């Protein structure tokens, strides 16, 4: 992927997020500093640590959206966690190190995807060979084994050879079968058998286990360890050729890639390019009246501190250093302020960005301008019913005005208010859409006032409905 400059990053963010220029600029600089650091000598690289960001602003103004879009802009491991999900060491719940384990897991998935793309041509070739064999099977003959051979195979399975199990049923290929396979291979190349069903054997997906999930929260990957030791159970599935091919390509790709290399690269990717977004960090600030719950909140801050400062976390893929991981924390800080965080943690987030509350003009832009704006989403949904939905400019202005007024009169939930209002406004259209014969519906200012006017006038209804 080509390296994007701070201006290019901001330009992409502008396609999805309205306003908040200061936050976009700070995030873009922090990301590009990653690239600058990698151009320096190794000794200097070790000295330069990321300048972590703390974003403060009301709910619904774009904090989470900025973080979410970062994952699509840079090919870097990215995880979003909520600070309220963590508990102090000694309490039941997720420990703070799990955010680093999640980051490495995401890096492994990204690296695996890259490696699978590299070997896909060869994996596709092998998958097609297997499809030919399944569509034109030969006569099977049982391979006789003595007890010693059976014992060796069993030990091989238990010691990790289960992924390379050999099929004890060998095939006898006659001239007739050979000709059939040539014919099938030719038809496969011409996509003539895509809808034909074929039965394949695939590894059974591991079942969810509440105990292993709890172990994972405690930092113990017991479920994965047991899955690696025990033989993989195979199940038969009957699928169309086009779907079976994709399943077989995945299985063949796993055989062709080197997972030790994937894990090593994933760890390096996490350490040098990883981004962890910690949301709701204001919710772990202790209040003025301290009780056991408040003490636990401050304990979570102290547990997060060494992770942000730089430490080594053990994962099932190997030890991971957090020295150069970029941390972005965010919170509404409605009942507290960033200076209420423990001083040590404040110092680890040197860049402070305040996001502004949204205005009526911002709401108008949010409705229309972003690449996948709310209005474009509803227009696309109704297009599936053959209906052309049109919003007049006056209607858009009225929707924005109502959203702004409701936010001012009740709880301010920012841009999220628009989704609630649009859902109520278009309720009848969405309900009757499939049965309508008209090809075009225009939403006017009068229609908006008719649908929402009574609710806006009644403050009690506004609180419950909008």
Curated annotation (Swiss-Prot):
Question: Which species expresses this protein natively?
Answer: Lactobacillus acidophilus (strain ATCC 700396 / NCK56 / N2 / NCFM)
The disulfides recorded in the entry are: none
Q: Per its database record, what is this protein's job?
A: ATPase subunit of a proteasome-like degradation complex; this subunit has chaperone activity. The binding of ATP and its subsequent hydrolysis by HslU are essential for unfolding of protein substrates subsequently hydrolyzed by HslV. HslU recognizes the N-terminal part of its protein substrates and unfolds these before they are guided to HslV for hydrolysis.
Homology family? Belongs to the ClpX chaperone family. HslU subfamily.
Tell me where on the tree of life, at the top rank, the source sits.
Bacteria
| Pfam families found in the cross-reference section | AAA (PF00004), AAA_2 (PF07724), ClpB_D2-small (PF10431)
> What's the name of the protein?
ATP-dependent protease ATPase subunit HslU
Q: Any idea which UniProt keywords this protein has?
A: ATP-binding, Chaperone, Cytoplasm, Nucleotide-binding
């Amino acid at each position: 992927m080509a390296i994007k400059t701070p201006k290019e990053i901001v330009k992409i963010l502008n396609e999805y997020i309205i306003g908040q220029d200061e936050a976009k600029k700070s995030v873009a600089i922090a990301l590009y500093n990653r690239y600058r650091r990698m151009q320096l000598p190794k000794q200097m690289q070790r000295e330069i640590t990321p300048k972590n960001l703390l974003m403060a602003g009301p709910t619904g103004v774009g904090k989470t959206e900025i973080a979410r879009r970062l994952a699509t802009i840079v090919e870097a491991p990215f995880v979003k966690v909520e600070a309220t999900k963590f508990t102090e060491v000694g309490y039941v719940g997720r420990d703070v190190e799990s955010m680093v384990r999640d980051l490495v897991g995401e890096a492994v998935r990204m690296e695996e995807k890259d490696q699978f793309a590299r070997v896909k041509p060869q994996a596709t070739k092998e998958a097609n060979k297997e499809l030919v064999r399944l569509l034109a099977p030969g006569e099977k003959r049982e391979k006789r084994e003595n007890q010693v051979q059976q014992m060796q195979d069993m030990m091989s399975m238990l010691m990790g050879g289960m992924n390379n199990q050999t099929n004890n049923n060998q095939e006898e290929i006659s001239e007739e079968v050979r000709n059939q396979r040539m014919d099938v291979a030719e038809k496969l190349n011409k996509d003539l058998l895509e809808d034909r069903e074929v039965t394949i054997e695939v590894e059974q997906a591991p079942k969810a286990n509440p105990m292993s999930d709890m172990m994972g929260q405690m930092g113990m990957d017991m479920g994965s360890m047991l899955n690696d030791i025990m033989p993989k159970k195979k199940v038969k599935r009957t699928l169309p050729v086009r779907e079976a091919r994709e399943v077989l390509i995945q299985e063949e790709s796993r055989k062709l890639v080197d997972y030790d290399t994937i894990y090593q690269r994933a760890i390096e990717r996490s350490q040098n390019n990883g981004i962890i977004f910690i949301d709701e960090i204001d919710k772990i600030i202790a209040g003025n009246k301290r009780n056991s719950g408040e003490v636990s909140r401050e304990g979570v801050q102290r547990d997060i501190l060494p992770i942000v400062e730089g430490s080594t976390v053990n994962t099932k893929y190997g030890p991971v250093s957090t020295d150069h991981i970029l941390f972005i924390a965010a919170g509404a800080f409605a009942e507290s302020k960033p200076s209420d965080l423990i001083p040590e943690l404040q110092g680890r987030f040197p860049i402070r960005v305040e996001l502004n509350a949204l205005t009526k003009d911002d709401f108008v832009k949010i409705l229309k301008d972003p690449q996948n704006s709310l209005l474009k989403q509803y227009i696309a949904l109704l297009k599936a019913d053959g209906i052309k939905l049109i919003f007049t400019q006056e209607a858009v202005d009225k929707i924005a005005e109502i959203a702004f007024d409701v936010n001012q009169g009740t709880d301010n939930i920012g841009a999220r208010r628009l989704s609630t209002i649009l859902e109520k406004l278009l309720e009848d259209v969405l309900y009757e859409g499939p049965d309508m014969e008209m090809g075009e519906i225009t939403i006017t200012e009068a229609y908006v006032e008719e649908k929402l006017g009574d609710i806006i006038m009644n403050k009690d209804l506004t609180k419950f409905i909008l």
